[in-house]
Amino acid sequence: MAPDIATSPEKQKALNLVMTQIERSFGKGSIMRLGDATRMKVETVPTGALPLDLALGGGLPRGRVVEIYGPESSGKTTLALHAIAAVQQTGGIAAFVDAEHALDPAYAAVLGVDIQNLLISQPDTGETALEIVDQLVRSTAVDVVVIDSVAALVPKAEIEGDMGDAHVGLQARLMSQALRKITGNIGKTGCIVIFLNQLRQKIGVTYGNPETTTGGNALKFYASVRLDIRRVQTLKKGTEEFGNRVKVKVAKNKVAPPFRVAEFDIIFGKGISRLGCILDMAEETGVVNRKGAWYSYNGENLAQGRDNTIKYMEENPEFARNIEQLVRQKLEMGAVVSANSVAANETDAEEEYVEEE
């Protein structure tokens, strides 16, 4: 007679056994409970946006492949440059493979990147770019490598050929071969490899999402973290646009529960609004209260409107540090905010947001 496994303890025992076997076969993090709040002990690098760090379970994981994709001007390069700045601030070495030949050193410096010590390469072909990435990773000296972007990794055969020549699947094969070669070394050296990618439209798709990323399917499989970044609001003062509100969805995460969403501001010419992130988290955790347009702390009004409150925090850095410390304490105690809860499956249209004068 077959054993009765309908009872809850028996099922739990069987579940624990199969999860252990799967993790033993395919590695730690290959399966986990979606509601598990504890993150794996993987070293991470902050992204510059506190809500995104929460959504990722700590930050960008070391020794992993990360893909950041989204429409044009959504903040992909800005996010990558903030990660480079965070690595450099801890004494790490960063490299930027500029396949698009579009890096703005002045903007990178504003974001905190040490451009004097940033390694930069502007390769002519995709093969050269990926070979440079492989050698940098194998050197064990580099902590983060950013490739901007996958779409610009043009195979040598395509460059040497004529306009109009068909090169079906050439870039996809190149990416697949390169990732097979690079991935093992990345895990051993602890280097973060960040691929920035563009979106394309699939032709003839009637049902489902017509968007896809360039470079074939290999990167989707090899990436431990995939971030989908979208512009959802245009920030304005009167009629003047001064930034974007962006939403980042963690489309894939092998080191923490996926499908979380983070929202934050990117200010033109300044990058991610760190104080804006702190204020949003302070409001969600109850450190700062908002009634109508007024923000208050310990019963005392700070300023009217979000923009004015951020300005107040800029003028009072000690107060801002105190608020950040209180927010982090609340989060460490398990406070649930929008960034560490599972995302709703919805499509948001881009909106305009007008700040108070």
Swiss-Prot record:
One of its GO terms (molecular function) is damaged DNA binding. The gene is recA. Its main location: cytoplasm. Disulfide bonds: none annotated. Can catalyze the hydrolysis of ATP in the presence of single-stranded DNA, the ATP-dependent uptake of single-stranded DNA by duplex DNA, and the ATP-dependent hybridization of homologous single-stranded DNAs. It interacts with LexA causing its activation and leading to its autocatalytic cleavage. Keywords: ATP-binding, Cytoplasm, DNA damage, DNA recombination, DNA repair, DNA-binding, Nucleotide-binding, SOS response. ATP binds at residues 70-77. SUPFAM superfamilies: P-loop containing nucleoside triphosphate hydrolases (SSF52540), RecA protein, C-terminal domain (SSF54752). The keyword Electron transport does not apply. This is Protein RecA. GO terms for biological process: DNA recombination; DNA repair; SOS response. It comes from Cyanothece sp. (strain PCC 7425 / ATCC 29141). It is found in: Cytoplasm. GO terms for cellular component: cytosol.
